[in-house]
Swiss-Prot record:
A UniProt-annotated Pfam family: Abhydrolase_3
Source organism of this protein record: Escherichia coli O157:H7
Domain of life: Bacteria
Enzyme Commission number(s) from the entry: 3.1.1.-
Gene name linked to the record: aes
Family, as annotated: Belongs to the 'GDXG' lipolytic enzyme family.
Subunit structure: Homodimer. Interacts with MalT and MelA.
PROSITE patterns xrefs: LIPASE_GDXG_HIS, LIPASE_GDXG_SER
Protein name, as recorded: Acetyl esterase
Motif Involved in the stabilization of the negatively charged intermediate by the formation of the oxyanion hole: chain residues: 91-93
SUPFAM superfamilies in the cross-refs: alpha/beta-Hydrolases
EC supergroup of this enzyme: hydrolase
The UniProt record lists the keyword DNA-binding: no
Gene Ontology MF annotations: carboxylic ester hydrolase activity
């Protein structure tokens, strides 16, 4: 798509989304566009500090979990001693950026609104980790906490997966992995998916939307994919292109959230339409006026806070 033919997104977004876009952090250096991945990761962590401030306090513990790839850090957010379930959270960042600090506020609010234990998994980033390593790390963490639930004083009889962007893909892929390989980690009561990518290679929204403001041009998306996958054949794997998996049976209840001006919106729409057509329990909600990644901005955006509350409410309704 010729750039001039794309929608004028920054003119169309909501007033509160514009406020976020125009919020300056004077102490922040410029984005290292030509820098190394390590430099971009460092910048992303610094930039997110402002947006993570003021999150609710609660009991928080960090644990290292063994996997066949080595130790993976996890962080437990415990809003109450007797949690009705445990939610595993997978952060976004195009598979190449992000960590437990960049998504701290999201996880704390999700724990607070659901009153469930939330476990963030600091999976190995790409290109250091190639598909399917990250999914195997997530599954290993689930199995570990299921086996050690009594020691960690968590309720693993009912679990869920949640994630934003690339983390949403990982959340659903992990749930399908457990189903397909018949791995018992407790009943998967629900999956919470905020503006994920699920396997479309092209779409109307991918053509009309995406630019420097969200890091989701066609070139950006190709770069993330090439960093994450091991080879070209992986593009058709049912744990990367989730539309190649069996979505007609035993899919856990899915909350699917879409951002109106997100180039990945059609992925969410297609996922919802596919699940609904096969009577799989699901709910789709579109958040008007929003850009991809809006969930980070609950400090300033009521819509972001609403989206987190909606996901938490959906999950607790499944328990």
């Amino acid at each position: 798509m010729k750039p001039e033919n794309k929608l004028p997104v920054l003119d169309l977004i909501s007033a509160e989304m514009k406020t976020v876009v125009n919020t300056l952090q004077p102490d922040l250096p410029p984005w290292p566009a030509t820098g190394t991945i390590a430099e971009q990761r460092q910048y992303y962590t610094l930039e997110r500090r402002f947006w993570n401030a003021g999150a609710p306090e609660m009991a928080t513990k960090a644990y290292m979990v063994p996997t066949k790839y080595g130790q993976v850090e996890t962080r437990l957010f415990c809003p109450q001693p007797d949690s009705p379930a445990t939610l595993f959270y997978l952060h976004g960042g195009g598979f190449i950026l992000g960590n437990l600090d960049t998504h701290d506020r999201i996880m704390r609010l999700l724990a607070s609104y659901s009153q469930c234990t939330v476990i963030g998994i600091d999976y190995t980033l790409s290109p250091e980790a190639r598909f399917p390593q990250v999914i195997e790390e997530i599954v290993a963490a689930c199995c570990y906490f299921h086996q050690q639930a009594e020691d960690y004083q968590i309720n693993m009889s009912r679990i869920g997966f949640a994630g934003d962007s690339a983390g949403a893909m990982l959340a659903l892929a992990s749930a399908l992995w457990l189903r397909d390989k018949q791995i018992d980690c407790g009943k998967v009561a629900g999956v919470l998916l905020w503006y994920g990518l699920y396997g479309l290679r092209d779409s109307v929204t991918r053509r009309l939307l995406g630019g420097v403001w969200d890091g989701l041009t066609q070139q950006d998306l190709q770069m993330y994919e090439e960093a994450y996958l091991s080879n070209d054949a992986d593009r058709e794997s049912p744990y990367y292109c989730l539309f190649n998996n069996d979505l007609t049976r035993e899919v856990p209840p899915c909350f699917i959230a879409g951002a109106e001006f997100d180039p990945l919106l059609d992925d969410s729409r297609l996922l919802y339409q596919t699940l609904a057509a096969h009577q799989q329990p699901c709910e789709f909600k579109l958040y008007p006026g929003t850009l991809h990644a809006f969930l980070h901005y609950s400090r300033m955006m009521k819509t972001a806070d609403e989206a987190l509350r909606d996901g938490a409410q959906f999950f607790t309704a499944q328990l």
